[in-house]
Each structure stands twice: as structure tokens, then as C-alpha cells.
Amino acid sequence: MMVLRVEELVTGKKNSNGAAGEFLPGEFRNGEYEAAVALEKQEDLKTLPANSVKQGEEQRKSEKLREAELKKKKLEQRSKLENLEDLEIIVQLKKRKKYKKTKVPVVKEPEPEIMTEPVDVPRFLKAALENKLPVVEKFLSDKNSPDVCDEYKRTALHRACLEGHLAIVEKLMEAGAQIEFRDMLESTAIHWACRGGNADVLKLLLNKGAKISARDKLLSTALHVAVRTGHYECAEHLIACEADLNAKDREGDTPLHDAVRLNRYKMIRLLMTFGADLKVKNCAGKTPMDLVLHWQSGTKAIFDSLKENAYKNSRIATF
């Protein structure tokens, strides 16, 4: 077996015995591979450092040019604020973008309260006040009376009317609650609805047959109560339902007397618009106009007193 030297394998030359490296590929013969490798190494040693430095500088220059071009394009693309309309458009776009980003919190509806245990009277009355319909329904479903009351003879209907809990009022009336049930001061449900300023409840009560002329212990009608408490919508509805504009309470005061005494301008205008009597006298012999003059003179006296005191204080300060 013929043994070849490494030199002969690389160069492809014949050995001393005259055997040729015929098994080598053609491009590796006659020393071409060796010469090519040597030349390649020499070229690398000469050109690599210079080329790498040059390429790095060119790359940095091109990056700077690219950045400058991008900045120029961005400046050109920016909208110019030529008028207030442009500014308003930009503000609206920013608001819209901010609105899209903000997440709307999902509010979970409270689960309906399931009542299993019996409900006593105090809890039932409190539930009517606090608008807890399941508690009220449980009490009524156990065949209890809807007209149970507290120590002041106030029923669940009175409490619900005061707070304006329409669903509970409807439920109590379906269960047979008495609309004309009177508390210790002989107020009925419509008195309590007007006291709370709940026009929707008042309308429901009147539609169900509540007496618009009902009076309490002070002989006040629901219109008296609405005027005193300043609930305009309730007073307006009562007048539309033909409530007595000139009804007198125990002191002989009409709703207009009360409106003037409490200086409720809108109520005065409402009552006068629908024909309230300006000349009717109360038990003290005073008409609504007399009360106006009395109020004006009283106010004038207060202002005169304040002016006089201010004048005296200013004279003392000068000494």
C-alpha cells in the first residue's frame, strides 16, 4: 500500500517514487489550493482592519442620515395649528384616545335576598323604611297584617310613602293596606307622601282612591303640608286634582297664608295663579296680604336697627 505525505496531499505533487496524487480533485492539483490559501491569508491581513473601520464609519453615517430623514418626515406630518378649530380637533382626539384606554368598571347587581326565617314587626317596619322589598314580601306572605304599626301608630305604608319607595307602596296596597289609616297625629298616607315630596307615590295613592281632603289633627290638608315643606310638584298635582285652595287649618291659615309666612315665592305664585283668595282671614284676622306687609315692616325694622347700630359704631370709632 502506498503512503503519501501531508505535503503531497496538499500540493498534489508526485512523491519521490513517482506516484502521482491522482485521487485529489482537479482544483487541488499542481499546488493551486496551497497558493490560493496563502494569497487569501495575505489579503486578509492587508485589508481586514481598513475595511472594517471604513464600513463602521459608513454605517454610522447612514444611520445618522436615516434618523435625520425620519425627524424631518415627522415634522412635516405634524398638523399646523392655524386656528381654534384645529386645536379643538386635537383636544377631541386626545379625549377619545383617553376614553378608549380607560376601562369601564363592571358593577355587579346585588343578588336578590332570599328570606327563609320569619320576619317580626320591627324588622318589617324597618324594611319598609329602607326599601327592602324581599323582607316586606316575606312578612306579607306569612299572612301577617300590612297595617301593623309602631308606638306612634305609623304603619309600613306611612314609612314607604315618606321615603318614596313606590314598589313597596304597591306591594302593601296589593296586600290590603288601608290608605286612610291615621297615625297618632291623624296624618294619612297622602300627608306622608307630601311631607317626603314624593309626587309619584302621591299620584298612585290618589289613583287608588285616597281622599284629597283628608285632614290631620291640626286640620291641615295635604296641600298645606306640601306648601309648608316646599314640595312644588306635589302641590301642583294636588291643585290639578282640585284640592281646596282656601282650606283653613286649626289656626285659620290657608295654604297661601303658610306660603307667605314661609316666604315661598314659587308656591305663592302657583296658588295665586289658580285663584287662591288673597282676602281670606285667619283666626288672628290677618289676610295673606297683611302677613306680607307685616313681614315687610318687620324686615324693614331689622334693617333700620342694623343701620343705626352701624352708624353708632362708626361715630365711636372716630373718637
UniProtKB/Swiss-Prot annotation:
Ordered alphabetically, the record's keywords are: ANK repeat, Coiled coil, Nucleus, Repeat
Spell out the InterPro entries in the cross-references: Ankyrin_rpt (IPR002110), Ankyrin_rpt-contain_sf (IPR036770)
Q: Which GO terms describe its molecular function?
A: DNA binding; histone deacetylase binding; p53 binding; R-SMAD binding; RNA polymerase II-specific DNA-binding transcription factor binding; titin binding; transcription coactivator activity; transcription corepressor activity
Instruction: Give the multimer and partner information.
Output: Interacts with TTN/titin and YBX1.
Q: Give start-end positions of Basic and acidic residues composition bias.
A: 55-65
Q: What is this protein called?
A: Ankyrin repeat domain-containing protein 1
Membrane-spanning parts = none
Among the Pfam families in the record, one is Ank_2
Gene encoding the protein = Ankrd1
The answer on whether this UniProt entry bears the keyword Transmembrane helix reads: no
| Native species | Mus musculus (Mouse)
- Gene Ontology cellular component list: cytoplasm; cytosol; fibrillar center; I band; myofibril; nucleoplasm; nucleus; protein-containing complex
Its taxonomic placement starts with:
Eukaryota, Metazoa, Chordata, Craniata, Vertebrata
Where is the secretion signal located? none
Disordered: region residues: 46-65
Coiled coil region boundaries: 53-89
Q: Which Gene3D superfamilies match?
A: Ankyrin repeat-containing domain
- ANK repeats sit at 152-181, 185-214, 218-247, 251-280, 284-315
